A protein has these predicted regions:
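Phosphate-binding beta-alpha-beta segment of Rossmann-like dinucleotide-binding domains, i.e.
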Residues: 78-134, 146-149, 153, 161
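A short helix->loop->beta-strand "cap" motif at the edges of active sites that frequently abuts
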Residues: 54-59, 78-80, 156, 211-213, ...
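Rossmann-like adenosine-cofactor binding region
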Residues: 163-238
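Gly/Ala-rich phosphate-binding loop of Rossmann-like dinucleotide-binding domains
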Residues: 53, 148, 152, 233
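Conserved beta-strand positions in the Rossmann-like core of class I SAM-dependent methyltransferases
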Residues: 16, 159, 222
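Glycine-rich Rossmann-fold phosphate-binding loop(s) that bind the pyrophosphate
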Residues: 140-141
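An N-terminal-biased, well-structured beta-alpha scaffold segment characteristic
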Residues: 1-81, 202
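Hydrophobic Val/Ile/Leu positions in short beta-strands of Rossmann-like dinucleotide-binding domains
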Residues: 38, 135-137
Length: 238
């Protein structure tokens, strides 16, 4: 609907919608079009790009900030331009991240299930106070910076890890990743997925965390090793 609304101002552009994600099986349907628009679950590797190129596609539009699912080197070699949305509603994502943290920390989801089943026992619903605790933010781009400001509003000490320091966050202390993992009561991930962040959270890094730590990931799922996460849950780390 948002696309259709925007199209009212561009009479020379038409859009056709497909339910299926873009991959090697569906790329053939691009014939006759000038561009394709994809999302986070699309697989735009070298094989897909070759099909797109042969069909006359010279523009790939990603309606998301991340582009880890696009072989940008192959796209560049073929002369296909790849564009993305560098930032959209960073506060909304950061608020969701804090909402998830609060649901965990205050056992809101458990309380909801109990009340729905007419169980008003308070057993197992005791939470902890975030005020005065340490929030560790991994990645301080637009979303991570918004999360830093939210955590500050809760009266938390905010530390962060990022290759590039955000100069606007003068209240944030940048530290090495190992220190962040070991000192934080809340760890929130806001980094892109690439070769350096794939399984950034694994068995070794989980072992470094405090017992009872709150871990929130609103970035790409592959930043966290799922098997290691399950083991950490079973070991009562979280």
């Amino acid at each position: 609907q948002s696309f259709d609304k925007a199209l009212r101002h561009f009479s020379d552009i038409s859009i056709e919608y497909m339910v299926a994600d873009l991959d090697v099986r569906t790329a053939v349907y691009s014939k006759g079009y000038d561009a394709v628009c994809a999302f986070v679950n699309s697989v735009i590797d070298a094989d897909v790009l070759k099909i797109l190129y042969d069909n006359g596609i010279r523009l790939v539009l990603m309606r998301c900030a991340g582009f880890n699912n696009v072989d940008v080197n192959e796209a560049d070699r073929l002369g296909i331009t790849v564009m993305r949305v560098p930032g959209y509603s960073p506060e909304a994502v950061a608020e969701l991240a804090m909402g998830l943290a609060l649901a965990t920390q205050r056992r809101i989801h458990k309380a909801y299930i109990k009340v729905r089943e007419n169980n008003f026992s308070l057993h197992g619903l005791t939470g902890v106070t975030l005020h005065g605790k340490t929030a560790g933010i991994v990645g301080t781009g637009k979303i991570g910076a918004a999360m830093c400001r939210i955590c500050r509003g809760f009266g938390m000490k905010v530390i962060a890890y990022d290759k590039y320091h955000n100069e606007s966050l003068d209240f944030v202390e940048y530290v090495e990743l190992d220190r962040l993992l070991s000192e934080s009561d809340l760890i929130s991930l806001h980094c892109p997925l690439d070769d350096t962040t794939y399984h950034l959270i694994d068995e070794r890094t989980i072992e470094m965390m405090k017992n009872g730590v709150i871990l929130v990931n609103t970035s790409r799922g592959a930043i966290v090793n799922t098997d290691a996460l399950i083991k950490g849950i079973r070991d009562m780390k979280f």
